[in-house]
Structures are given as structure tokens and as C-alpha cells.
């Protein structure tokens, strides 16, 4: 998934914070 440990991974939206 795009959300990993609260960080935004490149090319993924929306981002998790």
C-alpha cells in the first residue's frame, strides 16, 4: 500500500501522515 509507517511513498495520493 502507499501508506507505510506514516510516510508518503512516491507516486501515491493521497498520502498518510
Curated annotation (Swiss-Prot):
Post-translational modification: Contains 3 disulfide bonds.
Sorted UniProt keywords: Disulfide bond, Hydroxylation, Secreted, Toxin
MF (Gene Ontology): toxin activity
Domain of life assignment: Eukaryota
Subcellular localization(s) per the UniProt record: Secreted
GO cellular component terms listed in the entry, alphabetical order: extracellular region
Entry keyword Ribosomal protein: no
Disulfide bonds: 2-16, 3-12, 8-15
Residues annotated with 4-hydroxyproline modification: 14
Tissue-specific expression: Expressed by the venom duct.
Family indicated by similarity: Belongs to the conotoxin M superfamily.
Domain note: The cysteine framework is III (CC-C-C-CC).
Protein's name according to its UniProt entry: Conotoxin tx3e
Amino acid at each position: 500500500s502507499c501508506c507505510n509507517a506514516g510516510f508518503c511513498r512516491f507516486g501515491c495520493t493521497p498520502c498518510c501522515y
